[in-house]
């Protein structure tokens, strides 16, 4: 069993945490995040240190406490440093262009794909074949990146499609006659 729940979270300067029962709100330079946790978990704040503990000793309560601790830690990291996911477009004529809260994608379809961005997420396109998704909420950043990748996942024969920058595409050999 992992012991993640037992390690406390030290808050960096400039981060404000408010706890109201099972609701935890974190404010920082990159924004504010809030989350409601399971009733089997108690969260406490003392002298700039957040501790998470299960209310009883059941396996489920410890699992929920570990999850809550990881989520709170990611909230603190998100409002201080932020999270980012890099995507690459591989293929002839595949392009991306950010226009405010909309990402315009040309992915070889007969029509352009316009992806609406949720609140708290920004997208940059350093080049026409690169996309950088940034935000304070790790889950939302990952979800947006997965949705963008889902429009044209990489195929195994030529490697064409939208892929994560650090993703390795397992290539297949073409059928031999």
From Swiss-Prot:
Domain of life: Bacteria
Xref: InterPro entries: Ribosomal_uL6-like (IPR000702), Ribosomal_uL6-like_a/b-dom_sf (IPR036789), Ribosomal_uL6_a/b-dom (IPR020040), Ribosomal_uL6_bac-type (IPR019906), Ribosomal_uL6_CS (IPR002358)
Keywords on record: Ribonucleoprotein, Ribosomal protein, RNA-binding, rRNA-binding
Annotated SUPFAM superfamilies: Ribosomal protein L6
GO biological process, alphabetically ordered: cytoplasmic translation
GO molecular function, one term: rRNA binding
Alphabetical list of Gene3D superfamilies matching this protein: Ribosomal protein L6, alpha-beta domain (3.90.930.12)
CC per GO annotation: cytosolic large ribosomal subunit
Family as reported in the entry's similarity comment: Belongs to the universal ribosomal protein uL6 family.
Function: This protein binds to the 23S rRNA, and is important in its secondary structure. It is located near the subunit interface in the base of the L7/L12 stalk, and near the tRNA binding site of the peptidyltransferase center.
Subunit and partners: Part of the 50S ribosomal subunit.
Name of this protein: Large ribosomal subunit protein uL6
Organism, as annotated: Hydrogenovibrio crunogenus (strain DSM 25203 / XCL-2) (Thiomicrospira crunogena)
């Amino acid at each position: 069993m992992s012991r993640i729940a037992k390690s406390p979270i030290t808050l960096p300067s400039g981060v404000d945490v408010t706890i109201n029962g099972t609701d935890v709100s974190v404010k920082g330079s990159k924004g504010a995040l809030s989350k409601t946790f399971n009733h089997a978990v108690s969260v406490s704040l003392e002298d700039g240190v957040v501790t998470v503990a299960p209310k009883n000793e059941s396996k489920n309560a410890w699992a929920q406490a570990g999850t809550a601790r990881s989520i709170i830690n990611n909230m603190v990291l998100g409002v201080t440093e932020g999270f980012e996911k890099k995507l690459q477009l591989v293929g002839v004529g595949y392009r991306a262009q950010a226009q405010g809260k909309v990402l315009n994608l040309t992915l070889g379809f007969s029509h352009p794909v316009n992806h609406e961005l949720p609140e708290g997420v920004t997208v940059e396109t350093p080049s026409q074949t690169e996309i950088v998704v940034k935000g304070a909420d790790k889950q939302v950043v990952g979800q947006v990146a997965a949705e963008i990748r889902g429009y044209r996942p990489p195929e195994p024969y030529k490697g064409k499609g939208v892929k994560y920058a650090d993703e390795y595409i397992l290539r297949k050999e073409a059928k031999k006659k």
